[in-house]
From Swiss-Prot:
Protein name, per record: o-succinylbenzoate synthase
The EC number(s) this enzyme carries: 4.2.1.113
Cofactor: a divalent metal cation
Pathway where this protein functions: Quinol/quinone metabolism; 1,4-dihydroxy-2-naphthoate biosynthesis; 1,4-dihydroxy-2-naphthoate from chorismate: step 4/7; Quinol/quinone metabolism; menaquinone biosynthesis
Reaction catalysed by this enzyme: (1R,6R)-6-hydroxy-2-succinyl-cyclohexa-2,4-diene-1-carboxylate = 2-succinylbenzoate + H2O
The keyword Nucleotide-binding is assigned to this record: no
Residues at the catalytic site: K110, K212
Residues at which Mg(2+) binds: D138, E165, D188
Keyword Hydrolase: no
MF terms (GO), sorted A to Z: magnesium ion binding; O-succinylbenzoate synthase activity
Length: 327
């Protein structure tokens, strides 16, 4: 991860920090903070979640630099099918949430959230299944193997699942679960948070690889990993702003094959974004570069103390880019 022409003073000089209000609580937060960098090639987004320490967050900074200073890959397709995203909400809220994803034929439903029960997960999934033909669920590693096996039975009692995303935390658990159930398994955290992102595939622990641009270090880094994977790839958002979504669409548009809907419709989870949200047409988005609206940047600007927090974070992450590259 070599930043190339992006010096630290240059990055900080080009920095904008925004706080995006969310419609519903997601990943335990109601406001999403991200740092945006305007470079010679466009805008990049640094939005590593607040609890991530510099060694993990550095890849997210590399992704922002890649977008702001690098060149995008060639486009292979002009239409990216997307899935709707349904947080851990009561079933009554499901129709309103799905209405923000016009034409989407696939929905990803959050399950295994703290404080939730399997029964409430089943109710939520069935409410989604009544409105969308293809349903996948995401447990974010929240189950043990036995719990995941039980959940697979309960969640498929009234219809199939496209896949279980990260039902358990470790590669070993995923491999054991895959031997025990027939529902396909997708790996997310087991790829993006691993020292070796290919280990889960080599272990035969997943049927689908969920890849996210920012945690993997940028579009080109993601495409390099995807080229080494012999299972289908789904490109997904890391709760990105419109800038980060554009990077995800660029990656999805460059893949040689794209079999599944991508998780790149999460802009609908924000009350306000830095650019006008792209509206899906027949359940799909078109890849395009995005430039934030100056008025929105001003209106959504983070408080001075939060801006300084992100500056300090970039200063802590930046030296690690060279260290990861062996320089």
């Amino acid at each position: 991860m070599i930043p190339g022409p992006a010096t630290l003073p240059d990055l900080l000089d080009r920095l904008q920090v925004v706080a995006l209000p969310m419609r519903v609580r997601f990943r335990g937060i109601t406001t999403r903070e991200v740092a945006l960098i305007e470079g010679p090639s466009g805008w990049g987004e640094f939005g590593a979640f607040l609890e991530y320490q510099p060694p993990e967050a550095a890849a997210w900074l590399a992704s922002a630099i890649d977008a702001a200073y690098g060149q995008p890959p060639p486009v292979r397709r002009g239409r990216i099918p997307i899935n709707a995203t349904v947080p851990a909400v009561p079933p009554a809220q499901v129709p309103e949430l799905l209405a923000r994803f016009p034409g989407a034929r696939t929905a990803k439903v959050k399950v295994a959230e703290p404080g939730q029960t399997l029964a409430s997960d089943v109710e939520r999934v069935n409410a989604v299944r009544a409105l969308v033909p293809t349903v996948r669920v995401d447990a974010n590693g929240g189950w043990s193997v036995d719990q995941a096996a039980q959940a697979a039975v309960a969640l498929t009692a009234d219809g199939p699942l496209e896949y279980l995303e990260q039902p358990c935390a470790t590669v070993g658990e995923l491999a054991e679960l895959r031997r025990r159930i027939e529902v396909p398994i997708a790996a997310d955290e087991a790829i993006r948070k691993a020292e070796d992102p290919l280990a889960v595939v080599r272990a035969g622990a997943a049927d689908v690889a969920v890849l996210k641009v920012a945690p993997l270090g940028g579009v080109w880094a993601l495409l390099d990993i995807a080229a080494q994977i012999d299972i289908p790839v789904v490109i997904s958002s890391a709760l990105d702003s419109a800038v980060g979504i554009a990077a995800g669409l660029s990656a999805a548009a460059a893949l040689p094959q794209l079999q599944h809907a991508c998780g790149l419709g999460t802009g609908g989870l924000f009350v306000e974004d830095v650019a006008e949200p792209a509206i899906p047409v027949d359940g799909a988005l078109a890849p395009q570069r995005v430039a934030p609206d100056p008025a929105r940047l001003r209106a959504l600007g983070a408080a001075p103390d939060r801006r300084q927090w992100w500056i300090d974070r970039i200063k802590a992450c930046y030296p690690l880019l060279y260290r990861r590259s062996g320089d």
